[in-house]
Each structure stands twice: as structure tokens, then as C-alpha cells.
Swiss-Prot record:
Full protein name: Protein king tubby
Lineage: Eukaryota, Metazoa, Ecdysozoa, Arthropoda, Hexapoda
Keywords: Cell membrane, Cell projection, Cytoplasm, Membrane, Nucleus, Phosphoprotein
Positions carrying Phosphoserine: S147
Organism (species): Drosophila willistoni
Region spans: Disordered: 113-152
Gene3D superfamilies for this protein: Tubby Protein, Chain A
PANTHER family membership: PROTEIN KING TUBBY, TUBBY-RELATED
Membrane topology of this protein: Peripheral membrane protein
Record family assignment: Belongs to the TUB family.
Length: 451
């Protein structure tokens, strides 16, 4: 680059630095020893080192006498000079309009051709760059993620917390539409019009009553591993969560001894978990392989006045090849009437078919079919994930969300682990506490053909 072009470019850069649009650090001090002490009166320049000689008045190659600390403003025929902190003689800053105009045109022409080079261009001060995060393949330890390595069970998978939903009544519940105007919200919580449920009336009646529309019941299940027979049959307790850590007992369940298949007794009396107890609410029974579970109420299958009713059927997909991954489950419920009550279906009644038989025959008029929401594979955590919105904190193969195919964003029920023996269980319409608790109990039971 010719010498005069380089000098003009330096003058252009000095003028640009002194303009109001640029902010220049005037109080930046470099910590270096200077005769054993720091001088607060040391004059600071734009260039420090060999480049400082370029801005010196004694520079033999200096052509322009323009002071870099002054900025000229042209307003009509008047010339206004604004002196900077390093200006000593403002009279040297005044020049004719023609000279400034010619220099500006020449500088603009030079800058348009991008004639800067590394020697003449000022080197700006740069902040120290932060190290980039290591890639997923690096060995740098990450913060704890919900993945298979963090599981408590060897076949657990990761998850997240409750996807939001504007409820839509699924097929089989189309008798009355949802009050969508009162249930709109981005997270399905009370902020969007949905309220948290509370116990109304007696416990034994409440646990059998379907959840009202627009109400979310947040519950917690605790597992007592001591249970019965030295821990062979744990006891499970369901509580409704209240504010400030309070809770209300709803149901208790345990596995029956001396039963050919898995058989759970559910009662609203925590002190007496037996079929003969006054608080007996129903039972959960599985097939031999543990792939199908049926939920019954407390009725008598041999009674004609109060026959035993089917409350739900839970079917787990078989996994004969033993592939690891989340479970796939199907839940069939009785349909809902116009007044939001369950359709009475009894497999004990020889005059009608049970829920499982209706589902096998594809007779969906009086039943509702739900499925677990398919988790999404996360490449970063190398795990399957679901959005539980803070309600689930640990990975487990037992974590699931139940949805209807017509509206996958309406979470009918969700269940997941928060600690080794504590789980959260949230449910909505059309489930009742008995149905939701029985579905959760089925996830605890061992499944020969599903693991």
C-alpha cells in the first residue's frame, strides 16, 4: 500500500474513533511495572507501543495536522470543533471546509476499496473468550441428566414433566362437550382455568367418583417396602397433595398372598387392607403373564342386586425379544353418560360383555381407549424423554402419561418417580382416584413377558 494511502487511512480511523458514535475506553489501564510504582497521571493514547510514534507531531511522515482527539461538525457555513480529553490547542483543529471535504472524499474512496492492512489497522482490545462447551463425545463431566445411567431400575428411561392441554372429549365421552373456554391454558394448570381438586364428601364415595371437568388432582404414592412377609408384599399408599406439604389419605393397596395371579386389594382404610374390611373399594387382577390387568369395584360377582362392575383394563405390549425401552400400554375405560357418570359394564353379568371383550370385538360405543404418550428420543441425554413440568424428577421405566388419540396434548393421567419409594400421580376427567391408583399399581407389578 502506498505511504500516503496508509496515512490517510490512519487519519480516517482516528477521526472515526473520536466521533460520538464510537465509544473508546479512556480509563483502561494496563497493569505493568513502571519504575516500581503506578503513575495515575500517565497520559493514555489510542496506540501504545511502536504505533504511538505514528500519532506523534514529530513523525516525519505525518501529513495531516488534524488532532485525533477533536471531532469537527459542519452546520451550514459554521465550523464547530469539539475538543477531546487530549486536546491542548483548539486553534490547531480549525481548517478550511474545502480541505476537510477533499480529505473526506479521499478517505471514503480508500475505505470503499478496503485498503487496510494488518500494520496500519488499529488492534482493538478484545475480551477473553470463554471456552466453548465440549461436545457430547468429550469426556468432560456433564450435569446430571435423566438417562439410563441415572436409573434406579436397569430398564428405566428418562422423562420430563406435564404437557399442557386444552382438553377435548375423546370418543366414547362425546355426550357433552368440554368447557374449553374455562380450560384454555398453555400448561394445563390452574393458570389456564383448571383448578386443583379437593376431597368432597366421604372418602369412600369420592375415590369412586369421576373427576369433574376442569379439575386436576395431584396425588402422591408412597411405597412401604416392609409391607407384609418381610417385604415380599409392599404396601402402597395414595395421598392427595395439599398446600404447604400437607396431604390427605385416599387409598391403600397391597398384593394378596396365595393367589395364582397378581391380585391387589384396594381400600380406603389404611389400617385394614382386606377384602372383608368396610373400606374395601375394589381390586386389581392380572393374567398369568402379567400383560393384562382388570380393575373391579367392590361389588359381588354372584350378586344380581349389586353386581361387580369393570372399572378399567390395562394391557401391556409384550416384549418377547427383550428390547430395552419404554413400555407400551393401552388402557380401556367405560364410556361416560350425559351427566358425566360411567357406563355400567360388568363382565360378571352373563347378559353383557366386559370391557376387555368389547375392546377385542372393536365395539367402541361404550368404552374409551387410552394409550401411553410416546416418549421422544433425546440425542444429548441418550434417553427417552417426556415433559412432566416438574412433577417427575427421576428416570424410570414406570413413568408414563396417558392420552387419547384424538388429542395427544390432553394428559388424562401421568405417573412418575420422584425418589426411590415416592411417586407422583396426577389424573383428570374421566378417571376417578380408584381407577388411577389401580393403573399405577399395575406398573409396579412384575411382568414376565414385558421386560
Amino acid at each position: 500500500m502506498p505511504m500516503y494511502l496508509r496515512q490517510l487511512m490512519e487519519a480516517y480511523i482516528r477521526q472515526k474513533r473520536a466521533s460520538p458514535g464510537m465509544v473508546q475506553a479512556s480509563d483502561l489501564q494496563i497493569n505493568r511495572p513502571m519504575s516500581g510504582m503506578r503513575s495515575n497521571s500517565r497520559e493514555l493514547h489510542a496506540y501504545d507501543g511502536p504505533m504511538q510514534f505514528m500519532s506523534s507531531p514529530q513523525n516525519p511522515d505525518q501529513i495531516l495536522t488534524h488532532n485525533s482527539s477533536a471531532t469537527s461538525h459542519i452546520s451550514g457555513n459554521n465550523l464547530i470543533s469539539v475538543g477531546g480529553a487530549g486536546s491542548r490547542n483548539n486553534s490547531n483543529n480549525l481548517r478550511t471546509l474545502s480541505t476537510i471535504s477533499q480529505e473526506a472524499d479521499l478517505i471514503e474512496e480508500i475505505s470503499s476499496h478496503e485498503l487496510e492492512d494488518e500494520e496500519s489497522s488499529p488492534v482493538p482490545m478484545q475480551e477473553q473468550q470463554k471456552p466453548l462447551p465440549l461436545s457430547a463425545n468429550s469426556t468432560r463431566p456433564r450435569t446430571r441428566q435423566q438417562s439410563f445411567s441415572d436409573t434406579l431400575d436397569e430398564d428405566d428411561y428418562a422423562n420430563r414433566n406435564i404437557a399442557a392441554a386444552a382438553p377435548v372429549r375423546p370418543a366414547g365421552m362425546a355426550a357433552s362437550p368440554y368447557k374449553e373456554a374455562n380450560l384454555e391454558g398453555s400448561n394445563g394448570t390452574a393458570n389456564g382455568g383448571e383448578s386443583e381438586g379437593d376431597v368432597i364428601g366421604n372418602i369412600d364415595q369420592f375415590v369412586m367418583q369421576p373427576a369433574p371437568q376442569g379439575v386436576l388432582y395431584k396425588c402422591r404414592i408412597t411405597r412401604d417396602r416392609k409391607g407384609m412377609d418381610r417385604g415380599l408384599f409392599p404396601i402402597y399408599y395414595l395421598h392427595l397433595e395439599r398446600d404447604y406439604g400437607k396431604k390427605i389419605f385416599l387409598l391403600g393397596g397391597r398384593k394378596r398372598k396365595k393367589s395364582k395371579t397378581s391380585n391387589y386389594i384396594v381400600s380406603c382404610d389404611p389400617t385394614d387392607l382386606s377384602r372383608q374390611a368396610d373400606g374395601f373399594c375394589g381390586k386389581l387382577r392380572s393374567n398369568v403373564f402379567g400383560t393384562s390387568f382388570t380393575v373391579f369395584d367392590n361389588g359381588n360377582k354372584d350378586s344380581t342386586e349389586s353386581p361387580r362392575l369393570d372399572l378399567a383394563v390395562i394391557i401391556y405390549d409384550t416384549n418377547i425379544l427383550g428390547f430395552k425401552g419404554p413400555r407400551n400400554m393401552t388402557v380401556i375405560l367405560p364410556g361416560m353418560t350425559e351427566d358425566d357418570q360411567r357406563v355400567k359394564i360388568s363382565s360378571a353379568d352373563p347378559k353383557q360383555q366386559g370391557i376387555l371383550d368389547l375392546w377385542k370385538l372393536k365395539n367402541m360405543d361404550n368404552i374409551v381407549e387410552l394409550h401411553n404418550k410416546t416418549p421422544v428420543w433425546n440425542d444429548e441425554t441418550q434417553s427417552y424423554v417426556l415433559n412432566f413440568h416438574g412433577r417427575v424428577t427421576q428416570a424410570s421405566v414406570k413413568n408414563f402419561q396417558l392420552v387419547h388419540d384424538s388429542d395427544p396434548e390432553y394428559i388424562v393421567m401421568q405417573f412418575g418417580r420422584t425418589s426411590e419409594d415416592v411417586f407422583t400421580m396426577d389424573y383428570r376427567y374421566p378417571l376417578c382416584a380408584m381407577q388411577a391408583f389401580a393403573i399405577a399399581l399395575s406398573s409396579f407389578d412384575g411382568k414376565i413377558a414385558c421386560e
